[in-house]
Amino acid sequence: MIVRIGIMALRLCVLLALIFGILLWVNAIPDWGVMAHMTLGLLAVISLWLLAFGIATAPKGRNWGLAIGAFVLGLLLPIVGLGQLSWLSLGNAHIVVQIIHLLLGLGAIGIGEMIAARYKRQNKLA
């Protein structure tokens, strides 16, 4: 049950954070969008860690590699995201940081889906 809830929350939070992030990138929403994006990102990281906990403590098919990978990715995502605020002085190189943050976010949904699929396969959830 923890994996089902975790993957649904992760999907929703990453999708909404991605939408807010793109709108922020093109300056289409006001400054409150930053806080909404950060809140959704935090919820996505918590969901990812919930999935990591689920696969690490699964009765069958434990996978420590996926769990550790999800935990590390969950740490990197806000570090790079919050780091953007202080790295704005990089000028044109700032776009590289934005792209890295975007790729980490997409990686979060990817590893979350991998965890959910592995858990379902190993534990025969419908």
What are these regions (language model features)?
Residues M1-A126:
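Polytopic transmembrane helical bundles with strong interfacial aromatic enrichment
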